[in-house]
Amino acid sequence: MKKLIPAAFLLLAFVSCKKSTDNLQLTPISDYAPLTVGKYVTYNLDSLVYLNFGTIVAHHLYQVKYETTDSTTDGLGRKGFRITRYIRTLPSGSFSPDNTFLAVNTGTTFEFTENNLRFLKLVQPFEDGKTWKGNSAIDVSSLGSDLQYLYDWDYTYDSVGQPKQVGAFNLDNTVTINQRDDSFNLPVITSGPNETNIATRDYSQEVYAKDIGLVYKSFLHYEYQLAYHGYIGYGITLTMADHN
């Protein structure tokens, strides 16, 4: 009987671990990234740009609609969906298409390709503190690349399954992905013996809601250079305004 006890404990441990793993896998990627032709989300877009050689910050306001317009196949032969982005300058104006993207649900991940850059937006399991290299499929090391700031980002889940207010919407079930919050040599000092030579700031966060998809995005990337006492970079904020 004594010899059977270790085996029994091993069996219980195996069953316990299996149940724990199964529970973590219960939430499918499609819950937070539904891909159905005809589905759309409209956002208020605040676009930040630097003007006058980086000495002036300007904000441009638009509305954009991301609509799943067709199913397709990606370069790896996997089923994907074409996402068409439409834009207008006034809420009362007409939308005009201005870009297309590719979305792929692999069953365990959600990939989104824009401007030939493939981002690993979501992964299983949905668990607070879960981290992954969301930009690992992007070539940031080629000679002359201006994408080096995307290197080695750790995407991290936070507030999985929690309610959140986004714009005018009170959402019951969301997940926040903290993608980057990094700075170098800030604040910028523009005169004196300690004048800043170079400084950088990178911030990115996204929020997805169950049965809707992306509902909020905040992104900022800039670099300050003493050579021209100005900034290079851009930022965007997307806040959901409508969806079906």
Tell what function each PLM region has.
Residues 1-4, 18-19:
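Positively charged n-region of N-terminal signal peptides that target proteins for export
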Residues 13-16:
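C-terminal motif of bacterial Sec signal peptides marking the signal peptidase cleavage site
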Residues 18-244:
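Conserved functional acidic sites
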Residues 5-9:
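Sec-dependent signal peptide hydrophobic core
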